[in-house]
């Protein structure tokens, strides 16, 4: 029996695996003990994992269902309730030894087909579009640092085995603290035992809030950094809209980290994505005093601010209470660029002075970014950079949402395998770049 990938749906032997994390469920089915094994390098949500089901009947069809609860997905709409149930399903045929090995046994039907270790997880979808109002205050924003994954093994309508286990965005040794500055609010993630540790500031996009930034900060803090997830508007005590945001929000965040007793003040980096990357570039063109920058889906010009759903007729950013020159939003230019797939001219006065930045830079972006032309921005940043080290990666499937490895991304109607590959590649590039420039060899 062949599937669309030319693989035998009766599967293969699961081979020899080093089980680093093993979860075993036992349940009697006609005097057989069914075992479910989860194999992963760690419990962190940005690590791949394999599922092996042993002691099934040989050459039988089984349905594997995955349910995610309390799952925060960085790629999902901001208003999607985090307690919405996510689900994926795949049908497998056990091999002659009664084994289903997700990394080797092809899925014959369901949420995906063929062989993919993370196919079941990446193809999970929310069962409803239930939305929740976002909290107005930092203290009321949940940590969202873990989620539960339930695996059910089905034959027909009968559950013959099931197990729930936990995946984490944040390692158990990491603590957190809410920080309230004059121009920013943030959530600090740190190991209480850390000494002279490199630190990162994480700034997310045009939502301005802390949820997406903290998701990234939790994972990076679990990899040996003190991380400050920064909110720069949209919360009580901060500007209401993305307009006239003081660059001093980043200056203040950097000063906070430099004074932190556990931080090595000579090893600080910044991660900015989307509008946050624009903010980082604008600020660093005036105060280039960190050791490295990762800019995800960047812009090399200052764009007009946003007030609700409309353009604000002001700059996005200020310095010393003075607006930075900005590129005005013109609907005609925008429609022209989308219809003809050509870039519209950039206002020279709104260009960020990249030549003033000497920190090492990693640029990540898409050649098919649906929000703005990140690809040409990367080209312009590289051409105007006068420092000693700059590198970039461009992707051709994923658009503006290049985020955390393996997290479901249903924004794009593309080959999900390529979307997953690009999310993994861009995330690993981020980790390796920070490690290279901030961790002592």
Task: Walk through the language-model features, giving the residues of each.
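Alpha/beta-hydrolase active-site loop
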Residues: 241-261, 282
């Amino acid at each position: 029996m062949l599937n669309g990938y030319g693989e035998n749906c009766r599967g293969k032997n699961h081979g020899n695996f080093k089980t680093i994390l093993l979860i075993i469920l036992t349940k009697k089915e006609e005097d057989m003990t069914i075992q479910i094994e989860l194999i992963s390098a760690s419990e962190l949500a940005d690590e791949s994992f394999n599922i092996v089901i042993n002691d099934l009947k040989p050459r039988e069809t089984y349905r594997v269902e995955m349910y995610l609860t309390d799952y925060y997905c960085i790629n999902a709409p901001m208003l999607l309730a985090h307690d919405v149930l996510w689900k994926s399903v795949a049908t497998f045929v056990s091999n002659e030894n009664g084994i289903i090995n997700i990394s080797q046994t092809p899925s014959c039907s369901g949420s995906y087909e063929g062989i993919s270790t993370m196919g079941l997880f990446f193809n999970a979808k929310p069962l409803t579009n239930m939305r929740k109002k976002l909290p107005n205050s930092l203290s009321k924003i949940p940590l969202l640092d873990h989620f539960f994954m339930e695996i059910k093994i089905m034959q027909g309508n009968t559950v013959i085995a099931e197990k729930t286990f936990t995946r984490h965005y944040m390692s158990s040794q990491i603590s957190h603290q809410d920080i309230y500055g004059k121009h920013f609010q943030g959530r600090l993630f740190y190991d209480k035992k850390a000494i002279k540790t490199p630190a990162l500031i994480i700034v997310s996009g045009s939502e301005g809030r802390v949820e997406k930034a903290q998701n990234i900060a939790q994972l990076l803090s679990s990899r040996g950094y003190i991380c400050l997830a920064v909110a720069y508007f949209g919360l009580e005590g901060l500007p209401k809209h993305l307009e006239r945001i003081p660059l001093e929000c980043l200056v203040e965040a950097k000063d906070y980290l430099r004074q932190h007793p556990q931080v090595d003040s000579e090893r600080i980096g910044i991660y900015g994505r989307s509008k946050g990357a624009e903010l980082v570039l604008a600020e660093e063109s005036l105060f280039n005093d960190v050791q490295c920058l990762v800019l995800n889906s960047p812009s090399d010009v200052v764009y007009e601010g946003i007030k609700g759903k409309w353009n604000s007729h002001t700059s996005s950013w200020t310095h010393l209470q003075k607006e930075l020159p900005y590129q005005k939003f013109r609907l005609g230019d925008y429609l022209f660029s989308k219809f003809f797939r050509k870039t519209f001219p950039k206002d020279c006065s709104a260009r960020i002075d990249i030549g003033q930045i000497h920190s090492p830079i990693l640029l990540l972006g898409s050649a098919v970014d649906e929000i703005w032309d990140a690809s040409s921005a990367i080209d312009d940043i590289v051409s105007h950079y006068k420092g000693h080290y700059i590198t970039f990666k461009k992707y051709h499937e994923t658009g503006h949402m290049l985020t955390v490895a393996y997290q479901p991304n249903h924004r794009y109607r593309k080959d999900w395998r390529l979307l997953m590959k690009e999310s993994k590649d861009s995330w690993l590039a981020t980790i390796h770049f920070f490690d290279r420039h901030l961790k002592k060899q």
